From Swiss-Prot:
Induction: Induced by hydroxyurea. The record marks 69 as: Probably involved in interaction with DnaB protein. It catalyses: ATP + H2O = ADP + phosphate + H(+). The gene is dnaC. Belongs to the DnaC family. This is Replicative helicase loader DnaC. It comes from the Bacteria. One of its GO terms (molecular function) is ATP binding.
Amino acid sequence: MKNVGDLMQRLQKMMPAHIKPAFKTGEELLAWQKEQGAIRSAALERENRAMKMQRTFNRSGIRPLHQNCSFENYRVECEGQMNALSKARQYVEEFDGNIASFIFSGKPGTGKNHLAAAICNELLLRGKSVLIITVADIMSAMKDTFRNSGTSEEQLLNDLSNVDLLVIDEIGVQTESKYEKVIINQIVDRRSSSKRPTGMLTNSNMEEMTKLLGERVMDRMRLGNSLWVIFNWDSYRSRVTGKEY
């Protein structure tokens, strides 16, 4: 500190009289250096988080349209949306050690995918493994295992069962084949048995979901403090045009 103070005094003597020094004491200089160090450290942390997210996006199934989805940029225009946002935030905060799953149901374009992606993006930042995948993609991957793809059906089921959070999109859009029902049943059963939650996105109501997936799957989806959030407001897509959407 003495050396810094001596340096400041020498510099002040060398400066022209009309120039005012930014720092008058060694303490002020050190405080500024500490502040700048904290700013650089925060910037570096943000860059590292961004790089980590970029690396994981290719493995998470989060599509480019939803890679920037967050709780902060979720549009709230009614009480129902506020409730959905609050539930999603709470789900993330209580994720560790929680078996609770979630189902987001409602009409297309109401923000189900946005909030599901926001949950996954936040969990990625917290070091969790996540995967968002449609039923159609699951079934396509399953069919590939029959064509000597190098991955067996068992390996694929294990991969789907071992991520910290699996979100299955477009439940109810599929052809309702018996094989699809069996596969989804196996996935949910394995995940619940290993205390790993599952998310589902659907346009169907509870009665339709129960008919489609069966009571056993729906029972698994109710374990713990599981969520069923109904997105029953107007579609965003019907109110936007051009580049806004």
